[in-house]
Amino acid sequence: MANDNVSDYANAAPFARFANLQNRETLNPIGNEAKEIPYNRDQYLTWLAEGKLFQIGALTDAEIVAAWTTIKTAMGNNTFSETHMRSIVKIACNLRGITPGSTPLLVTYNPPQSATWAPAPSTDAIYSGTPVAGVIIPQNTGAGGEDTETEASKARAIAFICCYLLRFIVKTEEHLTNSLGNLKLQYSRLYSAQSATLSNWNPSNTWASRVKLGFDTYLTLRATVAYNIASADALLVPENVNYGLCRMLVFQHLELSGLQLYKMAMTLIAHFKLIEPNKFLSWIYDPLSEASIDQIYKIAVNYDNVNSKTHKHWKYAKLARGQYWLNTTVKRNQFLAYILADLELKYGLAGKSDYSSPKRMKALSGMPVERMTEAETISKAVEQMYTAIESAKRVDAGAAYRLAKKLGPPRANAHSRRKEPNNSRQHRDKQPNSKQQGRDKRNKHQVLGRHSKPQAQGPPNKQQDLGPHNNKPKEASRPPQQDRQQLAQPWRLTRRQRGARGHRTQTLSGMFCKGTCQCIQ
């Protein structure tokens, strides 16, 4: 039997025997549920200085080429270790810029006096997936081969590859297959040059899986990348010719890692240009999502603004310390994540393929279908509200848009009337126009009746004498009932009668006289 007072039961006071368990904050995390650490820049940098970073220095072209040969050999004979992973990071930070002689990712680290460097790397082999049987490098002869490529060109291509490998801190192995072709194309466009070293690099997925496992295993790798990339991001400005190179290769892939909810919300806010950011957050606000939405708001206000250009560590800190920004992860709030993902797809802000669709995120894989459907109704409501705002802005849209939306033809003076002074507009509105005069004439015709005859002008006759001895005019003789109906409703006449009377049908709303009957002219 259904009970309509479920809320009364749900809000009943807990038993007194459980009085000591009122605060959830006193509980330890259950399973692998981590507890969030509030982000603080100074505390974060102090934590990094406690043996989390290894030294990064400038490398010559010859040193880069020699280190790359060692990396390929180790990958081929299954001895790839943390030592080789550090070499990849060092080469990546020596990325050659588009401007000759520039290294945009190489920054100077000034550690505090109490700082300590990370210990020596491990030489234990990193095994992931199937062992690499050997890395096949095509043997090239003649022009265009690696044998004829200059050392500077090789070093530039190798640093480009190693910088690309940094993506696997956050990317899966499938990213290698899906992006390698475009990577080679982007190299040619950015540097306006070709490289046999890059063209001949066709690794298997084992490369990606081992690099990813190395980043997952060793904190010092992730921390060093997070610090150097954040520092370089703060130094580069969009006007710098190297900014696009670094953003394409690494910035856009590593920034806001683990802050998916914030990233999706900011993408939608940037798209919804007709409303302010606070209105969008108000639209999607849900008390059950309060922690996530509040964190989105705090990040936008305190960190992600034009006044914090020199501070970019907050964007990459989660790479090194995963306990930051937990409330903006998809796992913490699947419902809000699905709403934002659905909105991104509605407005074409994300890919629709299985690989790129935000609805295909691994953290959403176990979400119940009922909750997905409910989230889609919320995103549909957001779409409807924004469409209403768009329609209001398009009140003076052009003819093509109005025709497509069935809004009627545009007003010729719509824009000029908005700029017209009020006194001029009021004066113009008081002047009768031809359309208004026509409407007044038709209204007069309807009041008198289509087939009623107006009173003749001139002195009143005896029947019309309204003197004191005859206060009531004599009633004129009236035609029979049937004739009165035909006069009042001429469409009831037969075709022959209409022809005799001279009527013709113009519209369904009434008849127009040719002048042979006694109509008002």
From Swiss-Prot:
Keywords: Capsid protein, Helical capsid protein, Host cytoplasm, Ribonucleoprotein, RNA-binding, Superantigen, Viral nucleoprotein, Virion. Belongs to the nucleorhabdovirus nucleocapsid protein family. It comes from the Viruses. It comes from Rice yellow stunt virus. GO terms for molecular function: RNA binding. Residues 441-453, 493-504 have a biased composition (Basic residues). Pfam families: Rhabdo_ncap_2. Residues 406-505 are annotated as: Disordered. The gene is N. Residues 429-440 have a biased composition (Basic and acidic residues). Encapsidates the genome, protecting it from nucleases. If expressed without protein P it binds non-specifically RNA and therefore can bind it's own mRNA. Interaction with protein P abolishes any non-specific RNA binding, and prevents phosphorylation. The soluble N-P complex encapsidates specifically the genomic RNA, with protein N protecting the genome like a pearl necklace. The encapsidated genomic RNA is termed the nucleocapsid (NC) and serves as template for viral transcription and replication. Protein N binds protein P in the NC through a different interaction, and can be phosphorylated. Homomultimerizes to form the nucleocapsid. Binds to viral genomic RNA. Interacts with movement protein 3. Its main location: virion. Residues 454-464, 479-488 have a biased composition (Polar residues). One of its GO terms (cellular component) is host cell cytoplasm. InterPro entries: Rhabdo_ncap_2. This is Nucleoprotein. The keyword Membrane does not apply. It is found in: Virion; Host cytoplasm.
